[in-house]
Swiss-Prot record:
Annotated keywords: Amidation, Antibiotic, Antimicrobial, Cytolysis, Hemolysis, Secreted
Keyword Metal-binding: no
Name of the protein: Melectin
UniProt subcellular location: Secreted
Family as reported in the entry's similarity comment: Belongs to the xylopin-like family.
Tissue expression pattern: Expressed by the venom gland.
Keyword Secreted: yes
Sequence intervals crossing the membrane: none
Highest taxon in the source lineage: Eukaryota
Signal peptide stretch: none
Length: 18
């Protein structure tokens, strides 16, 4: 579902935020 996609993308987003 959407949450599984979110959990997959979130680490990448956090990496870009750094």
């Amino acid at each position: 579902g959407f949450l599984s996609i979110l959990k997959k993308v979130l680490p990448k987003v956090m990496a870009h935020m750094k």
